[in-house]
Amino acid sequence: MTEPTDTLFIVTGGPGSGKTTLLAALSEAGFATSIEAGRAIIQDQVAIGGHALPWEDRAAFAELMLCWEMRSYREMLGQVGRPVFFDRGVPDVAAYLRLCGLAVPSHIDQAARLLRYNRRVFIAPPWPEIFRQDAERKQSFAEAAATSQALVTTYQDYGYELVSLPLASVAERLEAISAITG
């Protein structure tokens, strides 16, 4: 698993940047997609009264995200041969920890180095016009922008090339992705 897998594409970005909407459109277009770990984990933890939440135990939250992302990666390996799109990837976990001022444990760093995706990673930049807070997204726009910067730095540190998506309609974002993925 140490070689980049050219058909596995990550769509990343700070909260409220439109990436999940874009992933839904990719799914509707017939592509295999994974769902975002963070939101699902928050919903599950709230439902069971758990504490692995970004506002309670960030390290535990990161561990659950790592497990989720590794499982998604393994599941999607069976789709190789056609483009697959992930709503975030393993390096997002390291970026989250860095953003929180926490050390990145060696096993998370190792996972980000071994589980490789296409070298080009799509990033949805901060977009104030569409940013909204909700029950799971408690960050301010400034925090979302800081998250985006942490993602850029982290992905570059792991050897990825960031491709910024346009601040445009979902259809235009799909066109930008198609121009690269074929």
Language-model segments: which ranges?
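Hydrophobic anchor at the beta1->P-loop junction of P-loop NTPases
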Residues: 11
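P-loop (Walker A) phosphate-binding loop of NTP-binding proteins
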Residues: 14, 26
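Conserved glycine(s) of the Walker
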Residues: 18
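Post-Walker A alpha-helix
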Residues: 22-23
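Conserved substrate/cofactor phosphate-moiety recognition/catalytic segment
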Residues: 27-68
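Glycine-rich phosphate-binding loop used to anchor ATP phosphates in small-molecule kinases
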Residues: 62-116, 131
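A glycine- and Lys/Arg-enriched "phosphate-lid" helix/loop adjacent to the NTP-binding pocket
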Residues: 101-168
